[in-house]
Every structure is written in C-alpha cells, then in structure tokens.
C-alpha cells in the first residue's frame, strides 16, 4: 500500500490498558517486569521510549527511522514520541509508515502502542524553505490565507497555540501518523508564549488551548493531553518562563472538570539536567518542591526527554558514575539507567539505527 493511501485510510482505535498489558505479557521473557510502567490512565509503557527529533530532512533518514521504529516495536518498546515540526513533518510520517507496516501485517495491534506528538511550532513541508521570503510565502499560503492563523497569533517567529491552529495541527498529525486517534497530545514548549505575554494573558491562552484539547478528547481524536517543555518546569518561579504545574491543573479543572484529561508532562531529566529531581521549582500550597515530587503529589505522569542530551552523555562521564552504575559497558547505557531509575513513566532516547536501539535496550536487562 502506498503512503498516499495510508494517509487516506486512518487506523482506528488507540492505546488501552488491556492492549498495553497484553503487549507487556508478550515480551515477558525478553524484558524484565520493571521495564514496563503505568501511566495515570492505566496504560502501560516501556521505560525506554523512542524519540524522533534529530536528523536530516531526507528520504534516507525517513527509511532509517521507519526501520528503527519497526524494530523497537518488535523488541518491546511501545511508546513513540514525535512532533509535527520534527524534520519538517517527516518524523511523524516515518512513524506512520512503521505503524502501518506492523499493524497491517498483524504484528502489533493499535491498542498496544502509545503514540505521542506535539503541536505549537509551525511545521514546514518536507524541507525548509531556502530563503526568508520563501518562509513568509509559505506562511501566507498555508496558514494566513486560509485563515488558520494570523500574523498576530505567532510568537517568536514560529509558535502558535490558538484553538483554530491547534485543531488544524491535530488533523495534520493524524494524517501524517495514519491514525484516527492520538494517545497523548502535547502543547509544545508553551513557555515560549511567555517571551512576549504577561502571565494573565498566557493563562488565557492555555485556557483556550485546554478547552480545545478537551473537545478533541470528547470527539475521540486524542486520549490525553499535556505539555512537553524544555525550560518551563525547570526554572524557578522568579523566571519569566516558569510554569507551575498546580496552576495549570487548576486551569484544566476549570475547563474540563475533575475528570479532565491534562495528565502527562514531558521535560528534560538526565545526568546533566537534574532540576526535576533536585531543584524546588514548584509551589504546591505553601510547599516548594522539585518537579518530580510535585507531579507525584498531583497525580500527573512524567516522560523524560533528552536522556542522552543529543549524544553528549554517551562519552566521558565521570569515573564515579561508572561505580554508581556497575555492569554497564558504555556511558550511554549508564545515562539511560540513571533516567530509568527515576519515578518517571519513560525515558526518551532518539534512535534512528537498529544497532543503537539494541545497545540501548540492554540497559534494563543488566540493571
């Protein structure tokens, strides 16, 4: 089946508690039991997730990602992370190609895989425009002209969270992924809006975005939603770009009631970026605690990103970390082991080669 037909025929269903538990049982002999962990909605995910951020915008890179996603699903990884802007939409499409292959072949059921994507940054189409004029022309033809968003909706040259824009991006992501429903949909670095907006106006933006996402949940288009951040939850309250989890949960309850679907946060946590573990950035009532403690208290799942910090943690780690993580033959696996030792659902690692996938999967087997 051609990729065009895949886009026209979306796979129904989404990840379920029962489906992901069945996936876990199927790999009982290949992965230790602690390799799988629950999200707050009961679905179970592998503690190593596959990320798709880096890479060239070309067909060869697409093929590498597709092959690695297929291999990951075959080896017990069932949480896939991407974003519509990654590699000019190619990362979503590579995942879609892989999912079509394994689902249509009967190797994997849709209900067994947790697929996550993000919206916020304006995605390009296959390759970046060659000039600034080309980019401006792209914005006008693709977004401004059709009325999906206007120039005043765009922050920092390429970030937007308006309701109509988010609705549009979700539909595009569905087609890219070949899926009728997305399991986790993140607002991508919402703290970017705080570069220009006062906090009260920012909360209005988040309120409107959460309302849009709750409506998408009711339609069955997404399962749960959250925020995928870089700085927001790691910086202190005094920082302009600070995000407070309790405050955002209050907004979610305001628009979605006590049974809202704001349930997952993604943020960097690794050997080099330990703020989520050590730095008390979050206020809960009169307490000030690190983010991971706040998430635990407030009942929000956490997915860790930048586990290897774009390969920076794959070499030259201090000798004391070798003794702290005995039995590991590489710094990459020590860094992954650190992330997997934390109270998070999954640690994301960008992987676009099967040998790297296989090396990284050795980590939980020897811990």
Q: Predicted regions: what is each one?
A:
Residues 51-64, 151-167, 196-200, 320-329:
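Active-site mouth loops of central-metabolism enzymes
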Residues 2-37, 164, 171, 188-367:
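Beta/alpha (TIM)-barrel catalytic core signal, keyed to glycine-rich beta->alpha loops juxtaposed to Asp/Glu
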Residues 76, 178-179, 223-226:
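Alpha-helical hinge/cap motifs
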Residues 64-68, 168-172, 334:
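Well-ordered alpha-helical segments embedded in enzymatic catalytic cores
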Residues 159-181:
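An active-site-proximal structural segment forming one wall of the substrate-binding cleft
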Residues 50, 80, 95, 115, ...:
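Conserved, mostly hydrophobic/aromatic
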Residues 1-141, 146-148, 164, 180, ...:
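N-terminal binding-site loop/beta-alpha segment at the start of enzyme catalytic domains
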């Amino acid at each position: 089946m051609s990729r065009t037909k895949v886009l026209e025929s979306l796979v129904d269903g989404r990840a379920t508690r029962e489906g992901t538990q069945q996936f876990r049982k199927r790999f009982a002999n290949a992965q230790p039991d602690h390799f799988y962990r629950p999200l707050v909605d009961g679905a179970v995910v592998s503690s190593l997730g596959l990320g798709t951020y880096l890479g060239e915008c070309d067909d060869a890179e697409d093929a590498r990602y597709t092959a690695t996603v297929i291999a990951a699903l075959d080896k017990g990884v069932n949480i896939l992370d991407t974003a519509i802007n990654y590699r000019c939409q190619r990362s979503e499409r590579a995942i879609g190609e892989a999912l079509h292959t394994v689902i249509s072949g009967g190797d994997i059921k849709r209900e067994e895989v947790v697929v996550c994507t993000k919206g916020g940054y304006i995605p390009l189409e296959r390759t970046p425009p060659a000039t600034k004029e080309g980019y401006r022309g792209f914005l006008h033809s693709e977004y401004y002209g059709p009325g999906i968003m206007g120039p005043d909706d765009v922050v920092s040259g390429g970030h937007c969270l308006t309701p109509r824009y988010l609705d549009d991006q979700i539909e595009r992501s569905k087609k890219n992924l070949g899926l009728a429903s997305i399991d986790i949909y993140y607002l991508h670095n919402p703290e970017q809006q705080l570069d220009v907006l006062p906090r009260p106006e920012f909360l209005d933006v988040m309120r409107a975005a959460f309302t849009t996402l709750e409506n998408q949940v009711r339609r069955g288009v997404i399962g749960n939603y959250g925020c995928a951040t870089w700085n927001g939850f790691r910086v202190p309250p005094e920082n302009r770009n600070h995000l407070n989890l309790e405050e955002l949960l209050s907004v979610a309850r305001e628009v979605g009631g006590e049974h809202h679907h704001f349930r997952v946060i993604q943020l960097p946590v690794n050997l080099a970026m330990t703020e989520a573990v050590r730095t008390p950035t979050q206020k809960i009532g009169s307490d000030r605690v690190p983010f991971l403690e706040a998430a635990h208290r407030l009942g929000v799942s956490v997915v860790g990103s930048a586990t290897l910090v774009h390969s920076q943690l794959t070499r030259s780690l201090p000798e004391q970390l070798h003794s702290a993580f005995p039995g590991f033959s590489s710094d990459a696996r020590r860094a992954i082991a650190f992330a997997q030792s934390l109270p998070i659902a999954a640690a994301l690692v960008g992987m676009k080669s099967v040998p790297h996938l296989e090396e990284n999967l050795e980590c939980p087997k020897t811990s």
